[in-house]
UniProtKB/Swiss-Prot annotation:
InterPro entries: RNA-bd_mRNA_stabilization_reg (IPR053125), Znf_CCCH (IPR000571). It comes from Trypanosoma brucei brucei (strain 927/4 GUTat10.1). GO terms for cellular component: cytoplasm; nucleus. A motif (MKT1-binding motif) lies at residues 382-387. A zinc finger (C3H1-type) spans 55-77, 178-205. Interacts (via MKT1-binding motif) with MKT1. This is RNA-binding protein ZC3H20. RNA-binding protein involved in regulation of mRNA stability. Promotes mRNA stabilization by recruiting MKT1 and PBP1. Stabilizes mRNA required for differentiation from the bloodstream form to the procyclic form, and maintenance of the procyclic form. Stabilizes transcripts encoding membrane and mitochondrial proteins, including AQP1 and GPEET2 procyclin. One of its GO terms (biological process) is mRNA stabilization. Residues 394-405 have a biased composition (Basic and acidic residues). GO terms for molecular function: mRNA binding; RNA binding; zinc ion binding. Keywords: Metal-binding, Repeat, RNA-binding, Translation regulation, Zinc, Zinc-finger. Residues 381-405 are annotated as: Disordered.
Length: 405
């Protein structure tokens, strides 16, 4: 089979140079976007595609019968195998959940930890989401470039030197305006193969799946082009064009919040209140466990002074058939299942969303109700008091006058 004869037969917008070698940009469904040397690509109809073509997996398996009439890319098997071995792991979610943190946004000592991204349709954080909740795709890179080029920057300066030179007094927050940028729908569905080269925003999947109001795959519905004005106060808003303007008060509140801690499979909290938890069923022998969403009411974050470790609810004598958590504080389940001893463990983490405990002066006592199934097929309600009547005998107690059959 003849290799592609001339690069002139291929659309120029799917061509690039990699280390001086002319390459064709191809989406590999098994990994991500690859740059295959043009000399290793066979002629097919993929060269006349108006969009970036995909790699023909049937050809790699020796089963494609279309030959030169195939609309996908045919490339040398050994070259594809070599390129796949060089591909870094695909971004999973965001920097907070294990993706590469290119700009050190997770370091609270770094000024990048004060950068938030404005997504108008989002309810999480009032629409101002920490940069660590995004993967570094093309729009984020473009916004960060606009941030760095919006003010003079001397070569060789580190972040602190640049910040001092650019702003004089360090700003309380930096807002990247992404209201006119589309959120990637395929990323939320674990189907995007463009990785950091995607032209859409890759938002944290926890935020996307818990915020049903987000507009995926198209420009946000509530987007309105902000007016241009000079920056004022302690916050700066940066758009892709590099302009700066004073942000709404919610932006400053989002920047003042600490870097969030991952809540596992639960939805992230918010400064004003949210739903957390997910419908989840687990089977342990004869015990069937289901967790359901619970309403979270947050209190004043200023009274939270220290984080708390895992609170052990003690052992119940009856296997759980239903666990419903209703609390005035933000809780998240430590493990995805209950232990064989049927101990219920909850992690009370004020640092996640600025919630606090009754013993810290908030006056909001948690109310955790566990409904169990007894041997007669009825249901009983158990109440867990983490402090107890005298502050020491905490544990699960059977509810008085609340049993139901």
């Amino acid at each position: 089979m003849q290799l592609v004869a001339s690069p002139l037969e291929t659309r120029r917008d799917i061509m690039c140079f990699e280390k001086g070698v002319e390459c064709m940009v191809v989406v590999d469904p098994a990994t991500r976007k690859l740059r295959i040397p043009l000399s290793c690509v066979y002629p097919t109809r993929a060269h006349q595609r108006t969009t970036i073509p995909s790699l023909c997996l049937l050809f790699l398996d020796g089963r494609c019968r279309q030959g030169t009439q195939c609309h996908q890319v045919h490339a040398a098997l050994n070259v594809v195998a070599a390129l796949r071995s060089q591909v870094d792991y695909l971004p999973i979610c965001c920097a907070l959940h294990g993706d590469r943190d290119y700009v050190n946004a997770l370091d609270n000592r770094s000024w990048m930890s004060r950068v938030v991204v404005h997504v108008p349709d989002a309810t999480y954080g009032g629409g101002y989401i920490p940069l660590a909740r995004f993967s570094y795709t093309t729009p984020i890179s473009r916004l960060l470039d606009a941030l760095f080029h919006s003010t003079p920057q001397a070569e060789g300066q580190d972040g602190a030197q640049w910040e001092s030179r650019a702003f004089g007094t360090p700003p309380s927050c930096l807002v990247l305006e992404a209201g006119d940028i589309t959120l990637c729908r395929l990323h939320v569905q674990d189907r995007c193969r463009y990785a950091e080269e995607c032209n859409y925003l890759h938002i944290c999947k926890e935020v996307a799946r818990c915020d049903r109001g987000l507009t995926l795959g198209q420009r946000p519905r509530s987007w309105k082009k902000p007016p241009s004005s000079s920056p004022s106060g302690g916050c700066f808003v940066v758009t892709a064009s590099g302009t700066s303007m004073p942000p709404p008060p919610a932006a400053a509140a989002a920047c003042d919040a600490p870097t969030p801690v991952s809540g596992g499979w639960t939805c992230p909290g918010s400064p004003t209140g949210s739903l957390f938890g997910a419908n989840r069923s687990v089977t342990l022998g004869d015990a069937s466990v289901t967790t359901q969403p619970a309403v979270v009411r947050c209190c004043d974050p200023s009274s939270c002074t220290e984080a708390h470790s895992v609170v052990d609810c003690g052992q119940a004598h009856i296997p759980f058939s239903l666990s419903r958590q209703v609390s005035d504080i933000h809780m998240r389940q430590v493990s995805s299942t209950f232990f064989p001893s049927d101990n219920l463990s909850l992690d009370v983490d004020p640092s996640t969303s600025g919630d606090c405990l009754a013993e810290q002066g908030c006056g909001m006592t948690p109310n955790i109700v566990v409904v169990t199934r007894n041997g007669k097929g009825g249901r009983e309600r158990w109440h867990y008091n983490p402090y107890g009547t005298n502050g020491t005998d905490r544990g699960i107690e059977k509810g008085e006058g609340r049993g139901r059959n």
